[in-house]
Regions:
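Hydrophobic alpha-helical transmembrane segments
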Residues: 1-175
């Protein structure tokens, strides 16, 4: 457990300093691809009925949670057998990838800076990078509201909940949450 606690602290500090570099492979992308691939296959196997979709959804959930938790657990076990220091390094990187402190701050500050400069087009573009809605007609109040809502939601999804899961069960439970 002490290795997971050290990895938790190192991963958190890495996230504060580095954030999510563009182009760096992110495990959540792989989890999303796994979901898409499994969903396609399960739709072919299970009937298109409420019961079939419920069964397919349950199986999908089970497989994704199992692999998202099991792969990190297995990888950390292998690393620990080689060297506890290797495990610390790998789990630190895993913890770093689960968190979104710096990236959330950086992206939301782009909205703030654009609003402060009075550039509505840049403000709309900046907020469009963090929300899932059409921003082309938003005024400054609506842009501010959209940014605040997104920051509040993503603080829960990308910072608070992952920190809780990482603190309880290390990177494997953090990936289980994701």
């Amino acid at each position: 457990m002490k290795w997971s606690l050290m990895a938790f602290i190192i991963g958190f500090l890495m996230d504060l300093l580095i954030g999510d570099p563009h182009g760096f492979p992110h495990p959540v992308v792989f989890i999303g691809r796994e979901i898409t691939w499994l969903e396609r296959g399960l739709r072919r196997i299970f009937p298109k009925s409420p019961g079939g979709e419920k069964a397919a959804g349950g199986l999908l959930w089970l497989v994704v949670v199992f692999t998202s938790t099991g792969i990190p657990l297995l990888l950390l076990g292998i690393c620990h057998r080689i060297s506890p220091w290797l495990r610390l390094a790998v789990e630190s990187v895993m913890c770093w990838q689960i968190l979104a402190v710096k990236s959330l701050r950086d992206e939301s500050m782009k909205v703030y800076d654009a609003l402060e400069s009075g550039d509505m087009e840049q403000s709309r573009h900046a907020v469009s990078q963090i929300v899932g809605r059409d921003t082309s007609t938003l005024d400054d109040a609506a842009i501010t509201r959209a940014a605040v809502e997104t920051v509040a939601e993503n603080t829960s999804d990308g910072i608070v909940a992952p920190l809780l899961y990482l603190a309880i069960g290390g990177a494997p439970l953090g990936f289980c949450y994701k």
